[in-house]
Amino acid sequence: HPYVVIAPSYMVYSIDFDQFLHTHIESGADVTLLYHAVDNAKEAYLTCNVLGLNRQKGVESIEPNHGNKKNQYVYMDTCVMKTELFISLIKEAKNLSSMYTLADILNDKCETLDIRGVAHKGFFASITDFPSYYAANMALLNYKSAQELFHDNWPIYTRTNDSCPTQYFNTADVKNSVISNGLSLIHI
């Protein structure tokens, strides 16, 4: 395959990777990074990297979010590039240090490679600890947020099983919850 798309398992978002790849090819960039503009980077996304972008959406830096700015471009650890370039970057990172990440080597190459950013629109969450996991789940209780993530034309394939409906006892007090079937809810 001529191109590779790298995406993490701890970022929650929806994107058409075919369109992302097409945008990369049309731009002529060496590497295209996906980012999400946020206005709460002082409190959230503190374990994520942020991008420094120029006016043409060219990436000038990839640095840790130190929580010193409210508005940031959070790097979603998602990128596309040619397979040969990916392999050469990984080899170079390995030769430099066993602690080097792909983001580290890309940051080193910002001046020599054409690295561009593409903005992501819609629901986005970075799940790196229990508080961010909880916050993402609570955000998805909002119907608009859930619609941004789950699209009608993109079905979710899951394994179903037959179980009885959830049973709510008289003492149950349930608010802001998504409840699966097969449960018995009581309040003691």
Residue spans of the language-model regions?
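Short phosphate-binding loop-to-helix
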Residues: 1
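Short aromatic/hydrophobic "clamp" motif used to bind/position activated sugar donors
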Residues: 4
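Active-site acidic Asp-centered loop
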Residues: 7-8
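Glycine-/small-residue-rich active-site loops that bind phosphorylated ligands and cofactors
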Residues: 12-13, 125
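Conserved core of the sugar-phosphate nucleotidyltransferase
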Residues: 14-84
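Residues that scaffold the ATP/ADP-binding catalytic core of kinase and kinase-like folds
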Residues: 62, 88-89, 136
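Left-handed beta-helix
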Residues: 84, 93-187
